[in-house]
Amino acid sequence: MENAKMNSLIAQYPLVKDLVALQETTWFNPGTTSLAEGLPYVGLTEQDVQDAHARLSRFAPYLAKAFPETAATGGIIESELVAIPAMQKRLEKEYQQPISGQLLLKKDSHLPISGSIKARGGIYEVLAHAEKLALEAGLLTLEDDYSKLLSPEFKQFFSQYSIAVGSTGNLGLSIGIMSARIGFKVTVHMSADARAWKKAKLRSHGVTVVEYEQDYGVAVEEGRKAAQSDPNCFFIDDENSRTLFLGYSVAGQRLKAQFAEQGRIVDADNPLFVYLPCGVGGGPGGVAFGLKLAFGDHVHCFFAEPTHSPCMLLGVHTGLHDQISVQDIGIDNLTAADGLAVGRASGFVGRAMERLLDGFYTLSDQTMYDMLGWLAQEEGIRLEPSALAGMAGPQRVCASVSYQQMHGFSAEQLRNATHLVWATGGGMVPEEEMEQYLAKGRS
């Protein structure tokens, strides 16, 4: 971006200067609306989410047999919700900032099959595509027991088709493993940020991995191009896919059920704050949409990004969405949070969800490493760096009187609040890689 343009952008949006300086930044969204007002802009409805629920239920018997690790939950891919009181104390001590309410962790980091939040959207979109092909070919009806998809006849049928996706790692892992199990030929286009172990794991499942020296945007674009030349190849578009988004959104009702089981109340007197790591935006956008449908105006969602990859904060704050990238303002998009190393946000998610999100913030790689170490020490839970992005949220919210006033929160409401950090990945990180992460944290 030439200097004159840059200067006028900063004059209009002074916050951009902090982003360019790679400072940890928080922006509370003044444009937040009620669910009733914001919902029409999403272009999807509660019925769409119910359809996704129903599809996952139809596939449950198949998943329970195809992936024995899901048998205990009857083929439903869901994660634990746990309180982390020792981590809450540690954060309060390190940041000298009390966190009112209770701190919880949603362990999508330990979801079966692929060990990340992408086991929601990625697996769902592969299943939706497989179902569509089998229904159209007359090989399946909605009433069937879907475990029949494990038969050689179906393997043979699906082997005529291929799937392609561009990814920094975790989405590729979930789509690659699921597609290969169903019988699709699958190619994952991996950006330079992708971890070697993720590529190796994919190859061990018979997935073709194409590696690029460039970032996420290039990997997606190349994947899209490669798929266009083959009519039997289906490209899963992380930047724009409504199907992926709906796969994530199912988490809302599931979380509501977990809250009910644990006797946790969410209402006007007991607000829920949720902190979601954000890359291109599909995962956190879909989850936030599902949460809004489940808890209405009593849930407040925040997106967390690395200081080197603040694409969604930049896009929503300036209103330019996918028309601007972090590289345009001189930021390098290089971060240890490989799953969040995205320079240009989803145009769909930013525009769909901007009215339903309370805020956006950035944090440095070092902050993520520090918190990764603290969580391992205090709670014995090990995550990958990007999964800690949400952990900085509670103190930002609790420290901001202006945000609390904007939403009219009383001290009592804040005392009754639940702060939920969405842990997005790390359950499958190899031991030696995890030791390297832990060594980088400052205790």
Swiss-Prot record:
Origin superkingdom: Bacteria
Top-level EC class as recorded in UniProt: lyase
Keyword Lyase belongs to the record: yes
EC number: 4.3.1.18
One Gene Ontology MF term: hydro-lyase activity
Reactions performed catalytically: D-serine = pyruvate + NH4(+)
Pfam families per the UniProt record, alphabetical: PALP
Keyword tags: Lyase, Pyridoxal phosphate
HAMAP family in alphabetical order: D_Ser_dehydrat
Protein name in the entry: D-serine dehydratase
Native species: Escherichia coli O17:K52:H18 (strain UMN026 / ExPEC)
